[in-house]
C-alpha cells in the first residue's frame, strides 16, 4: 500500500514553497499541490470526496474555504453575484465525505479566515456557515501575538527589526479534548520557522523544570527533581542554545512534558 498522500488545494495561489520547507513540510515525497484556476466549488469538493474514498490520501488541506465559489456564482457577472451560497453546499459535502474520513482514517484540514461580525455580541465570525462549524471535530484559532527580537525579548509592534512573533492558539471546539481554552503560544521565527526549543524552554520554566536566579537558569532532572549537573545557562537565549545543541536533553524534557504535563 505504501505511504498515504497529502493533497494541498491552494485556492488562494499563495503557498510559498520555500517557507513551507522551512516549516518542515516535505514537498518532494507524497505531497501533491493543486492550484485550480476556474473550477467550481462543486467540482473541487467532489474531487476531495473521490480522493479520500480512494484510500490513497491521508491528508487533504483546503486553503481556504472562503475562496470556494459555487457554479451558479462562477458563471455570473460581479453585478449579479449574491454571496453566502456556500453553506448549503458544504452541508451536502460533509455528509458525503465524513464517512470516508472515518473509514479510512484520513484527515481534512480546512483553513478559514476571520471576518467582522454583524452580530453585536460577536467580534468576528468565519465564512462557511453552521455546517462547517458543526462538522469539524476540532476548530483552532491562531492569532498573531507580540513581536520579539533575536534574544526572544518582546519588542514594540512598530519595530522594523522583528526576528519573529508569538502565535497565540485557542481551541474553539474539540471533540477530543477540553474545549474553549487557551492552549498557549509558540514562537515563529521569520528565518527558521517554528522555534521548538524556545517553546520547550517556556514550558520548562512554567512547569519548574528550570529554575531562575537573576539571569541564570538551572536545569532540573524531571524524574528526581534534583539539579541536573553540567547544564546551566545565563539568559534564555543560552537555554535555547543548550537545547538545540543537545538533542538528548531536548528529547528528555519533550517526552516528560508530553507524558506528564500536557493533558
Q: What is each of the regions a protein language model found here?
A:
Residues 203-213, 217:
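PDZ/PDZ-like groove recognition
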Residues 215-263:
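Terminal-proximal interaction/regulatory segments of ATP-powered molecular machines
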Residues 5-8, 32-34, 109, 140-142, ...:
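Short hydrophobic alpha-helical runs that function as membrane-insertion/retention elements
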Residues 2-83, 87-92, 96, 256:
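Conserved inter-motif catalytic segment of the P-loop NTP-binding fold
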Residues 51, 83-207:
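Phosphate-binding/switch region of NTP-binding enzymes
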Residues 32-41, 213-223:
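Short linear loop/turn motifs
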Residues 18-19, 120-121, 223:
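Short Asp/Glu-rich motifs
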Residues 73, 116-120, 213-216, 227-228:
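N-terminal cationic and glycine-rich segments that engage phosphates or anionic surfaces
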Amino acid at each position: 500500500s505504501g505511504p498515504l498522500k497529502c493533497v494541498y488545494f491552494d485556492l488562494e495561489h499563495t503557498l510559498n514553497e520555500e517557507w513551507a520547507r522551512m516549516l518542515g513540510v516535505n514537498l518532494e515525497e507524497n505531497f501533491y499541490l493543486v492550484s485550480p484556476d476556474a473550477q467550481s466549488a462543486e467540482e473541487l469538493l467532489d474531487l476531495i470526496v473521490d480522493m479520500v474514498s480512494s484510500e490513497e490520501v491521508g491528508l487533504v488541506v483546503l486553503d481556504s474555504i472562503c475562496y470556494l465559489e459555487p457554479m451558479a456564482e462562477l458563471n455570473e457577472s460581479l453585478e449579479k453575484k449574491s454571496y453566502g451560497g456556500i453553506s448549503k453546499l458544504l452541508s451536502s459535502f460533509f455528509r458525503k465525505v465524513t464517512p470516508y474520513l472515518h473509514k479510512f482514517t484520513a484527515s481534512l484540514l480546512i483553513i478559514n479566515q476571520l471576518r467582522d461580525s454583524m452580530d453585536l455580541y460577536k467580534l468576528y465570525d468565519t465564512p462557511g456557515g453552521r455546517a462547517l462549524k458543526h462538522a469539524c471535530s476540532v476548530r483552532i484559532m491562531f492569532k498573531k501575538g507580540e513581536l520579539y527580537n533575536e534574544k526572544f525579548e518582546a519588542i514594540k509592534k512598530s519595530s522594523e527589526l522583528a526576528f519573529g512573533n508569538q502565535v497565540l492558539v485557542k481551541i474553539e471546539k474539540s471533540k477530543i479534548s477540553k474545549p474553549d481554552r487557551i492552549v498557549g503560544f509558540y514562537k515563529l521565527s521569520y528565518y527558521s520557522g517554528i522555534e521548538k526549543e524556545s517553546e520547550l524552554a517556556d514550558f520548562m520554566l512554567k512547569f519548574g523544570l528550570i529554575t531562575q536566579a537573576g539571569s541564570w537558569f538551572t536545569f532540573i532532572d524531571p524524574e528526581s527533581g534534583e539539579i541536573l549537573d553540567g547544564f546551566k545557562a545565563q539568559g534564555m537565549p543560552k537555554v535555547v542554545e543548550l537545547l538545540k545543541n543537545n538533542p538528548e536533553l531536548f528529547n528528555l524534557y519533550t517526552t516528560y512534558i508530553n507524558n506528564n504535563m500536557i493533558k
